């Protein structure tokens, strides 16, 4: 399971890094894309914090300047790799409160997979937003990454 999650987080790291690099090159990043990518970073931080049983550093829809994306992304990834490296049981159940204070329980593997799936979902929305703004989206499909 560790190898599987490390591969997925490598993919996530690659995709987010490419998207950050692309946005830095642009004269103007569409506002919706900035909101969505900030949300990806925030959610990743929030899920890591839930797993570790500590408070999150960011709010769900907090907007970050592009110049901060790389550092936030790196810290999120570092934390996730630490979680997967130290995990002894991926089926352990973890209790956490959502943003409204409701208690939920999920397995570690489901929480980790959600981070990846959630990020992929919103990167596809960013790709659509790029097209809507006459920008060329990146090819970030998993199969392209594995080639």
Residue ranges and their predicted role:
Residues 1, 26-27, 65-66, 86-89, ...:
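General structural signal for secondary-structure boundaries
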Residues 9-61, 102-147:
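Short, contiguous alpha-helical
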Residues 2, 68-80, 130-143:
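Short secondary-structure transition/capping segments
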Residues 96-98:
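A short, surface-exposed loop/turn module that caps and links secondary-structure elements
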Residues 56-94:
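Helix-adjacent hinge/juxtasegments
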